[in-house]
Amino acid sequence: MPIDHFPSSTRYEPHTNATFSQRYFYDDSYYKPGGPVFLYIGGETSGEYRFSNLQTGIIQILMEATNGLGVILENRYYGESCPFASSTTDELRFLTTEQTIADNAYFAQHATFPTIDSSLNAPNAPWILYGGSLAGAQTAFSLKTYGGDDGILWGGIASSGTTKAELAYVEWYDPIQKYGPQDCVGSINAIIDKIDFVRSTGNTTAVREMKAIFGLEALENDGDFAMTIAFPLGGPMFYPTNNWQELNWNPEYNSEDFWDFCSNVTNLDAPENITQIDYSLAQHTNGEPWTNLGNYANYIKKHIVPLCDGAAIDSTACFGTQNESYWAETSNSGSRSYLYSTCTESGTYQAARPYGPPLISRALQVPYTQQWCTWAFPAGEYNSIPATPELWRYNKYGGYEVVAERLARIDGEQDVWLDLCYHSSNAPGRVTANAEEAEQHPQLLITGAGHHWDSYGILDVAAEPQFIREAHRWEIRTVRRWLDEWKGKRQSGKSE
C-alpha cells in the first residue's frame, strides 16, 4: 500500500514513494462466482479483533445471504499495518482521514485472493463496505469520495458512524442520564455537583479529604481524580473498565459492570460504616449529607483502585496522567495512533456539561485532554499538530449530512456516540417519505440499541431479539437492492 496517496499535496511534504504492508483477512466460505465483496473497515484496532464479524457477525450474515466474499482490512497505523518502526510526530503525518479512505479505494482495486480464480477487483466487482463507529464514518467518507455509478466502491453501511466532529463532546453522557436507573443517576449527579462545589472553594484540606474517601488522595490533579471516579460511567478517552458502551444484546459480548456499579451505588443494605460516610463531608455543604457517597466510594475502592495492581496511584501505571515523558513515548500503538487522529482532526473530547446535572466533574474539560496532545506530539522537522484539532478536515465530508450513492446509515437509540451520528438529536429529523427515498437514502434507528449493535450476530438471524433481527433483515434487503442495481447496470452497459 502506498504510504502517500497525495504526492501533490503540500500537507505531506516531504513526500515518499515508499509502500507498507497492510494486513487483510478474508473468508470465502460462502462465495460463489458473481457474488459481491464485503469490505469490513478495521477502524481503531487490530484486524484480529474484528474476526467475529466474519465468523458470526454482520459480514457473515451478508455473505451467507448473497454468496459474497468477506474481507477485513486493518487500518494504517494499527495492528501490524504500521508504515514506520515508530510513531514520531513526523512519521504520523500520513495518518489522516483522507489517506485512510484512499487506502480503502486502492485496496478494492488491487487486492488479491489466492483461493479465488478470477479477479474481484473494483470496479469490475461490486464492493460493499461496512464499518462501525470511526470505521462507520470512514465508510461514509469513502463512499462520498470514491463511490457512485462510475466510482470504485459500489455501496456501504455506516453503523454508528461518527461523521460529525466537535471539539467538546458533552453529549456522551446523555444516554446514561436518560436511560440509566434514575436513583443511581440522581445520586451520582448530586455527589459530583457537591464535589465540584468543594473544589470551587479552594479549600485544599477539604479536597484532599474528599479524595481520600475514594482512596485517591494521592491524585493531586483534580482532572485525574475526576476521570478515575468516572471510569464506571466512561472516562474521557480511556476505559479501563466496562461501562454503558459495553452493554450488548449478544451475551458473548455483553458486560453487566454498569448495572453492578449502579446496584452498588444504590445499595439499600450497605453496612453502617459505609452509610456513615454520606455525612463525612456534610460540614462543607451546609450540613447536607452526600447521599450514597459511601456506596460510590466503596465501589471505587473495591473495583477501580485494585486495577493498579500495587502501582503508585498517581503514576501513569495507575491513574496519573501528568507525566509528559509518558505521553512522548513514540512506540507504535493503537492508543497513540487514535490520540493523534483525535488531536489533529476529529477532536470530540469527552467533557462535562458546564451547566445542569453533570454525571462527571467539570474538571473534565477540553484543556484536560488537549494537554495530552501537546505532550505526546512535539513539533517534528516536517510536521506539527495544531493548537486544537482542525475539525474542518473531518467535517468537510458533510458532518451529519454525508451524501453518497448507496450509503446506508444505521444507529442505536441509546448509543453514547449517537449525537455524532446521522440520527443525532442535533441533526434534522429523519423521516422517509416514500419507497424511492428509502432506496436512495436507506436509514434505520434501532430502538433501545447501543454502539453498532447490528455488527454482532449469533449465526441465526431468526433467533435474534426482534429489533436486531429486523435490523439485519433490513440490511440484507438493502444490499440485495444494491446488487440488483449492479446487475441491471452491468447488463445495460453490455447491451449498449
Describe every region a protein language model picked out.
Residues L134-G148, G156, T163:
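Short glycine-enriched nucleophile-adjacent loop
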Residues D149-A282:
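A catalytic-pocket lid/entrance helix-loop region that shapes and gates access to the active site
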Residues D117-L134, Q138:
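Alpha/beta-hydrolase fold nucleophile elbow
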Residues A102-N124:
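Conserved acidic catalytic loop of the alpha/beta-hydrolase fold
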Residues P36-V37, G43-A105, L339, R430-L459:
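Active-site machinery of serine-nucleophile hydrolases
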Residues G34-V37, T66-G70, N124-P126, D149-W154, ...:
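Loop/turn elements at helix/coil->beta-strand transitions in domains of secreted/extracellular proteins
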Residues M237-S495:
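C-terminal subdomain of alpha/beta-hydrolase-fold enzymes, centered on the catalytic histidine
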Residues M1-L69, E80, F94, R477, ...:
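Catalytic-loop region of hydrolases
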